[in-house]
């Protein structure tokens, strides 16, 4: 939520359900994939079900590992520690930016090729 953390949008303007942005006629399969079989135009779900496709779009997403940084969970969302990767914290980022009058602000991002170059 870079644009929320940067004060461009209010958080409420950026929230939508996933179902509301699914293209009409598409099927949303809410299951984990265990294996791909491109030679058969198929994939196998974790429960063993095999799905065949003509066109496949895979959106694996990302899993954030907040516990990987010692002490982060203890202070995230207060003490000047925030993240634009967390929907409820992006407004706090903007609050911190607005109130910064001196000192240093540290911004980090994961290595490319992408999560979100600006977040």
Residue ranges and their predicted role:
Residues 51-63:
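Short hydrophobic core segments
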Residues 2-4, 45, 58, 68, ...:
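Generic detector of intrinsically disordered, low-complexity, polar/charged segments
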Residues 1-53, 119:
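N-terminal Rossmann-like dinucleotide/flavin-binding domain of flavoprotein oxidoreductases
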Residues 47, 60-61, 109:
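Glycine-rich, N-terminal phosphate-binding loop of Rossmann-like dinucleotide-binding domains
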Residues 64-119:
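Rossmann-like dinucleotide/flavin-binding elements
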Residues 15-18, 25, 58, 75, ...:
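Generic, low-specificity signal for short hydrophobic/alpha-helical stretches with a mild N-terminal bias
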